[in-house]
UniProtKB/Swiss-Prot annotation:
It is found in: Fimbrium. InterPro entries: Curlin_rpt. This is Minor curlin subunit. Residues 1-21 form the signal peptide. GO terms for biological process: cell adhesion.
Length: 151
């Protein structure tokens, strides 16, 4: 487990601007955790991914400065994707349950977005093109879908 975690951390740190975590583990459920902090030329980008369960996947792409992304997944078959560009943007995805799908896309300056999914089969998408926008989506049931676009 320690060698697997070390290899994963070195792989993630070697890819500037991209963090990916998956837990396609055939053994019992474990807690997977990845942190990628990119401080090259004061970019100060950080991606934090925590996973418990099976077949969860998380992907983060950051291009800009002062960017923070946090993804927490518990359950199975959850998918999370964060795409950040610009400056001072914050994205948070929390998934508890199974087969949830969440994505956040941010550009420009000073945006905050959060998706919280507690249930199964939910889909949520937040897209922020403007400056200093805030969006929060909470899905507490199953099979719900929402798309938020802020310009």
């Amino acid at each position: 487990m320690k060698n697997k975690l070390l290899f994963m951390m070195l792989t993630i740190l070697g890819a500037p601007g991209i963090a990916t975590a998956t837990n396609y583990d055939l053994a019992r459920s474990e807690y997977n955790f990845a942190v990628n902090e990119l401080s090259k030329s004061s970019f100060n980008q950080a991606a934090i991914i925590g996973q418990v369960g099976t077949d969860n996947s998380a992907r983060v792409r950051q291009e800009g400065s002062k960017l923070l992304s946090v993804i927490s997944q518990e359950g199975g078959n959850n998918r999370a994707k964060v795409d950040q560009a610009g400056n001072y943007n914050f994205a948070y995805i929390e998934q508890t349950g199974n087969a949830n799908d969440a994505s956040i896309s941010q550009s420009a300056y000073g945006n905050s977005a959060a998706i919280i999914q507690k249930g199964s089969g939910n889909k949520a998408n937040i897209t922020q093109y403007g400056t200093q926008k805030t969006a929060v989506v909470v899905q507490k049931q199953s099979h719900m879908a929402i798309r938020v676009t802020q310009r």
